[in-house]
């Protein structure tokens, strides 16, 4: 299996640091988390079950439909675009390697073992990467991080003490916008309240009565 990882590094010729982090972490077991620079962690994404993530094909179709022009552009759009490019390229190289291994292994059991390992273990990592960066581009990084935290709290809460349904990512932007608006408002104490205005009226009446007496 170590030889398989070595073949992966040789075939994964992505020139950027993001791809190097991904490949080197798989090979030598280095403590490299590809999500840390984006404010998340592998552990945070692990709260989401494996069947939560769409298939690689569906994620690739989504990325192509929404961000094809930006992904194919030579310009640097954002760190998420760069990471998404490298994840797509690594998956393509990985599929090429898996096909080559499958065609050249004579033992059917070994061939199935390699294919299943790629589809389950590495396939899940690619699905997580694709989902994370596509979601950050679609909904915003802060919204995705808030969703991961909310889902982690929900899944770790005993069923008797949590809502029946898990948080939904598409509904979080509405609450996030409201919170940002609340933060941007000026403090209400700067403007006089109706109670203060009412409290001033008796004083004015007293002053007017004193002037009339004089």
Curated annotation (Swiss-Prot):
Chain segments carrying region Disordered: 165-214
Compartments in which it is found: Secreted; Host nucleus
Region (3 X 8 AA repeats of S-P-R-R-R-R-S-Q): 186-208
GO BP of this protein: microtubule-dependent intracellular transport of viral material towards nucleus; symbiont entry into host cell; viral penetration into host nucleus
Keyword set, alphabetical order: Disulfide bond, Host nucleus, Host-virus interaction, Repeat, Secreted, Signal, Viral immunoevasion
PTM comment, free text: Phosphorylated. Cleaved by host furin.
Gene Ontology, cellular component aspect: extracellular region; host cell; host cell cytoplasm; host cell nucleus; T=4 icosahedral viral capsid
Keyword Disulfide bond: yes
GO MF assignments: DNA binding; RNA binding; structural molecule activity
Subunit architecture: Homodimerizes.
Described purpose of this protein according to its UniProt entry: May regulate immune response to the intracellular capsid in acting as a T-cell tolerogen, by having an immunoregulatory effect which prevents destruction of infected cells by cytotoxic T-cells. This immune regulation may predispose to chronicity during perinatal infections and prevent severe liver injury during adult infections.
Similarity field: Belongs to the orthohepadnavirus precore antigen family.
Full protein name: External core antigen
Source organism phylogeny: Viruses, Riboviria, Pararnavirae, Artverviricota, Revtraviricetes
Protein encoded by which gene: C
């Amino acid at each position: 299996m170590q030889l398989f990882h070595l073949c992966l590094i040789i075939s994964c010729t992505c020139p950027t640091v993001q791809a190097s982090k991904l490949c080197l972490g798989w090979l030598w077991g280095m403590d490299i988390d590809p999500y840390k620079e984006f404010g998340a962690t592998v552990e945070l994404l692990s709260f989401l079950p494996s069947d939560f993530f769409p298939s690689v094909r569906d994620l690739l179709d989504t990325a192509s439909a929404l961000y094809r022009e930006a992904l194919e552009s030579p310009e640097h759009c954002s760190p998420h675009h760069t990471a998404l490019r490298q994840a797509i390229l690594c998956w393509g190289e990985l599929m090429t390697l898996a096909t080559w291994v499958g065609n050249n292994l004579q033992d059917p059991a070994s061939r199935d073992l390699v294919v299943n390992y790629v589809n389950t273990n590495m396939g899940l990592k690619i699905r997580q990467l694709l989902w994370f960066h596509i979601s950050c581009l679609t909904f915003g990084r802060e919204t995705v991080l808030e969703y991961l935290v909310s889902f982690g709290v929900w899944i770790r809460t005993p069923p008797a003490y949590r809502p029946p349904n898990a948080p939904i990512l598409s509904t979080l932007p509405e609450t996030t916008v409201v919170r940002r608006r609340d933060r941007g408002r000026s403090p209400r104490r700067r403007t006089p309240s109706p109670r203060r205005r009412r409290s001033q009226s008796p004083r004015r009446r007293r002053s007017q009565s004193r002037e009339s007496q004089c």
